[in-house]
Amino acid sequence: MASKVVFFAAALMAAMVAISGAQLSESEMRFRDRQCQREVQDSPLDACRQVLDRQLTGRERFQPMFRRPGALGLRMQCCQQLQDVSRECRCAAIRRMVRSYEESMPMPLEQGWSSSSSEYYGGEGSSSEQGYYGEGSSEEGYYGEQQQQPGMTRVRLTRARQYAAQLPSMCRVEPQQCSIFAAGQY
């Protein structure tokens, strides 16, 4: 009987140690998350965002490296900005940069609906009145503002995420790849 009590007490003590260790890990994780959040806010990765934009808009792909004005310097700045962010927070910083880039992209007027309100402007080419989507060139949106073709935004967002996921590899920093599709991260 005494051995059962000793065994039970030892098991209870081990469980308490495990629980306190888990609580410590949880509080350490919260601290690290807050620290990362601050670090990510302080490091917007502006040069990386410009590299991403140049890559996606084609301003960088069709010129030889030596003819790209500032492209090499911009990549070096991007790599330096990535190195300035701690290893643990790099992927979160890249995710935030991509999210910021996505939020700045104009949304297409798909199927004639305005992305900012519930007003209907007519489908692509459905009206000859001025100001409708599809009037003139396929790049003009309502009242002539620049818009992307329907579906192009989704493709561009996917490419942005794929390219951004490879930035650490391009800069030779750890981790070599980041999951840009992770939700709920800064």
From Swiss-Prot:
Gene3D superfamilies: Plant lipid-transfer and hydrophobic proteins (1.10.110.10). It is found in: Secreted. Coiled coil: none annotated. Its main location: secreted. Residues 108-155 are annotated as: Disordered. One of its GO terms (cellular component) is extracellular region. It comes from the Eukaryota. InterPro entries: Bifun_inhib/LTP/seed_sf, Bifunc_inhib/LTP/seed_store, Glutenin. Residues 110-149 have a biased composition (Low complexity). Residues 1-22 form the signal peptide. Belongs to the 2S seed storage albumins family. Seed storage protein. This is 19 kDa globulin.
